[in-house]
């Protein structure tokens, strides 16, 4: 999950050994963590859900007495999160390797209904002459969320 106001995004995945299948996605414009938690619970009411969120969600906001992580825990989610996010280049390498490893194996599959994620993966651009994702394209949020997994 990647925390933003526009958009806040989440992917629903199934993990089987080393294989990850993205089976659904949620993109909410002008929203917040409370609403995302509610949407996840509405879509998957009888499932035990683990959330792999952005590590920055542990910080309380000046406008609130709580954090994004606290909101998710209070909603009943199990959080799998490190104290800091891995470096961007490491997350990109991990996702790229999952899409297709050197040996040709594929460890990450994406359901065709996950159109926003597919658009983000295929359309991600980088700042000229760098390996730094271009945040102006607005195609980075789903990719960031995928990298937290």
Language-model features: locations:
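Acidic, Mg2+-coordinating catalytic module of metal-dependent nucleases/exonucleases
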Residues: 135-149
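Mg2+-dependent endonuclease catalytic cores in nucleic-acid-processing enzymes, primarily RNase H-like
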Residues: 17-134
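Gly/Thr-rich phosphate-binding beta-strand-loop-beta motif of the actin/hexokinase/Hsp70
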Residues: 1-15
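Residue-level detector of short, conserved catalytic/binding motifs and their immediate flanks
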Residues: 8, 49, 143
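Short, well-structured alpha-helical interface segments that form or flank functional binding sites
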Residues: 5, 67, 140
């Amino acid at each position: 999950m990647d925390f933003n106001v526009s958009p806040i995004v989440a992917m629903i995945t199934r993990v089987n050994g080393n294989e990850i299948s993205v089976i659904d996605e949620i993109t909410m414009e002008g929203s917040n963590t409370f609403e995302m938690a509610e949407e996840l619970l509405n879509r998957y009411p009888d499932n035990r859900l683990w959330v792999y969120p952005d590590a920055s969600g542990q910080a309380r906001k000046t406008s609130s007495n709580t954090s994004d992580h606290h909101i998710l825990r209070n909603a009943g989610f199990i959080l799998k999160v490190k104290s800091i996010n891995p470096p961007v280049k490491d997350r990109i390498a991990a996702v790229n390797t999952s899409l297709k490893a050197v040996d040709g194996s594929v460890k990450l599959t994406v359901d065709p209904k996950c159109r926003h994620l597919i658009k983000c993966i295929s359309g991600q651009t980088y700042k000229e002459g760098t390996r730094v994702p271009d945040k102006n394209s607005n195609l980075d949020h789903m990719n960031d969320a995928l990298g937290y997994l």
